[in-house]
């Protein structure tokens, strides 16, 4: 599906943010035996996700209103979950961010699914009930 340049910018930014989140997660796994270092990396992951809503506003402004609302809702959900994990200080919650309960290794995480749907559905992206 053809994407507008504005949507392409949003998708590229989300892909970059996803890569940064995964780098933080991989860094945490690499130091799993060192609890303070593991905690710091998981907090970094959560802070990156918490920033999606605010940082994404500039990308959303350029999109059609319905897509702004739909994509903005998803960014809000990612950010709200991460802010909650940081607020309560749960490292387990931080580690589970982006992964549904039934997630299996090798399956895409929730942010990857969102990015893929934006890429595939373009301006016609709409929320699913599970979103």
Please state what every model-predicted region is.
Residues 2, 6, 13, 38, ...:
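Helix-centric, low-specificity signal for extended rod-like, repetitive segments
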Residues 11-14, 18, 46, 50-53, ...:
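Generic structural concept
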Residues 77-131:
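Amphipathic alpha-helical binding modules
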Residues 1-43:
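Short terminal alpha-helical segments
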Residues 3, 7, 45, 53-56, ...:
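Short amphipathic alpha-helical segments that mediate assembly, nucleic-acid/protein binding
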Residues 25, 32, 39, 60, ...:
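Coiled-coil heptad-register positions
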Residues 49-79:
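Short, solvent-exposed, charged loop/turn and helix-capping segments
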């Amino acid at each position: 599906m053809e994407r507008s340049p504005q949507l392409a910018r949003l998708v590229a930014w989300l892909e970059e943010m996803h890569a940064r989140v995964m780098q933080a997660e991989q860094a945490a796994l690499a130091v799993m035996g060192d609890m303070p270092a593991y905690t710091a990396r998981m907090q970094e992951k959560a802070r990156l996700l918490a920033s999606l809503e605010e940082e994404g506003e500039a990308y959303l402004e350029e999109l059609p209103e319905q897509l702004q609302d739909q994509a903005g809702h998803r960014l809000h959900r990612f950010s709200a979950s991460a802010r909650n994990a940081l607020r309560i200080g749960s490292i387990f919650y931080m580690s589970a961010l982006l992964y549904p309960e039934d997630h299996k290794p090798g399956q895409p995480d929730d942010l990857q699914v969102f990015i893929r749907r934006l890429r595939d559905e373009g301006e016609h992206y709409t929320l699913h009930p599970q979103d």
